[in-house]
Amino acid sequence: MAGAGLALLGAAAVLDAIVRPSPRFVWNLSASAPLGLYVVSSKGEIAAGDTVIARVPALWRLWAGRRRYIPINVPLVKRVAAIPGDSVCAIGTLVQINGRGVAIRRLSDGRGRDMPDWHGCTTLGQREYLLLGDGPDSFDGRYFGPTGRNDIIGKAHRL
């Protein structure tokens, strides 16, 4: 009987490692989105203007954690600014979507450290989105570029 219990516990641990449960609620303390508690719904169809919960793209996750922008295991609350098929450009300090300026990038953070600066123009692929925060100091797609659908956990609705 104990062996069956251990086997079940082991299977549960393996399943958890393979299928990470997504957060159901997120408490946002960042000024880049309205403060408060958000409920997370399944991914579903994502549209421009939606608020989503997303992981910092893997390339920037550890970097952002080291700078103490956001802990590596804490998701972001961001607005979907551009969707698949949109043209996104980052030229100098200006970020444009479909030829319209939508965000300004800072060259350095509040401590004087250089910020990342992806640059150029791209048309977002079928599983790419540009996520932006509402505040000018938001750490978001203006610095790390498009976010893949796999990093979007779900839509967020503020309670």
PLM features: residue spans?
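Mid-length scaffold segments of soluble, non-membrane domains
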Residues: P71-I104
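Acidic/glycine-rich C-terminal interaction modules and beta/coil loop segments
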Residues: R105-A156
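Short, surface-exposed secondary-structure boundary micro-motifs
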Residues: K43, P57, T93, R100, ...
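Solvent-exposed loop/turn segments at secondary-structure junctions
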Residues: G44, V88, V95, D137-S138
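Protein maturation boundaries and topogenic segments
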Residues: M1-P75, T123, F144-L159
